[in-house]
A protein has these predicted regions:
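Active-site neighborhood of glycoside hydrolase catalytic domains
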Residues: 168-270
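Single conserved hydrophobic/aromatic residue that forms the stacking wall/gate
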Residues: 268-278
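Transmembrane beta-strand segments of Gram-negative outer membrane beta-barrel proteins
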Residues: 44-48
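Aromatic-lined carbohydrate-binding/catalytic grooves of carbohydrate-active enzymes
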Residues: 55-203
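Short conserved micro-motifs at the rims of enzyme active sites and ligand-binding pockets
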Residues: 21-25, 57-63, 236-237
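Structured core elements
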Residues: 10-12, 49, 109, 185-187, ...
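N-terminal accessory beta-strand-rich subdomains and adjacent acidic, glycine-rich linkers
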Residues: 1-37
Length: 279
């Protein structure tokens, strides 16, 4: 540890009634007050998304099966054969938008919309996504206009494949792309081993990155739902555009090995600044 240094608060919550522990806001309120003067643009939303069907194996994030590897900026997807199972296609996304509008959801998350998913995982690839180039069957402007006509917004997806430096190099361009196309919220993802090597999801370097991404997003009035991030510690009090942390074994595991019934109960009875986003 190097000086000067500030250590975080440590808390002990004691009560004769377990309900008091669950309701305690002490951890949240030990964080610094809100860092933003204007928070009128921050609004939690209910959303549905094009993602579960991929998790369940009914569709794919990738546009084609023809490419064992992708080189962004050089690979021409128009010369490939679509696999016919790409989930983030115009008609499918419009179907989700219609559902959201009918059932009172605010936004529609769309995963797999951007080029690069053919070799995104397990390749230790630095330049894996550019966060601004859609697949041929995903019309960004048309779909955002269609969503707007239905009183719904699209939610952006930034999977980084844990290539963190690549994300930081592109983050301003990615956030500006969102603003230009009507997005105001992003689900970020950090699947896989962290690049650069030697860093870990819960280490200080990555904690600094998560905070950097949230603060940078605020410059563009964008809210962040961080996935594969760290457990909530109340930083959302200081930076309230951090609207979610995926930090618990949630719904997606039901498509894998499943979760025990008691686990589902624990998620809602564990005291913390958890936001309830458990996808």
């Amino acid at each position: 540890m190097q000086a000067p240094c500030k250590s975080p608060w440590r808390t002990v919550i004691v009560s004769d009634d377990a309900r008091d522990i669950l309701a305690s806001k002490i951890t949240l309120n030990l964080n610094e007050p809100c860092a933003y003067e204007d928070v009128s643009w921050i609004k939690p939303v209910k959303y549905v998304g094009v993602w579960w069907e991929m998790i369940a194996g009914k569709s794919t994030w990738a546009y084609t099966d023809d490419l064992p590897s992708v080189k962004l900026g050089e690979t021409d997807y128009l010369e490939t054969k679509p696999n016919g199972r790409h989930g983030a296609n115009n008609e499918n996304v419009k179907r989700y938008i219609d559902f959201a509008a009918e059932h009172g959801f605010d936004q529609v998350l769309v995963e797999g919309w951007n080029e690069g998913w053919e070799d995104w995982f397990g390749k230790s690839k630095d330049y894996v996504f550019d966060f601004v180039t859609p697949y041929p069957d995903f019309d960004v402007k048309m779909l955002n206009a269609y969503a707007k006509s239905k009183g719904v917004k699209l939610m952006m997806h930034h999977e980084t494949s844990s290539s963190v430096r690549n994300y930081e190099r592109h983050i301003d361009k990615a956030y500006q792309f969102m603003v230009d196309n009507g997005y105001n919220a992003v689900k970020s993802g950090y699947v896989g081993d962290i690049i650069p090597r030697g860093e870990h999801h819960y280490g200080q370097w990555m904690n600094n990155h998560y905070l950097y991404a949230v603060k940078k997003a605020a410059d563009y009035k964008i809210c962040v739902n961080g996935h594969e991030a760290v457990r909530p510690t109340g930083l959302c009090r200081t930076f309230p555009n951090l609207i979610g942390n995926e930090s618990a074994r949630g719904t997606e595991y039901e498509a894998f090995g499943g979760s025990k019934p008691f686990h589902t109960c624990l998620l809602y009875t564990s005291p913390s600044p958890r936001d309830g986003l458990l996808s």
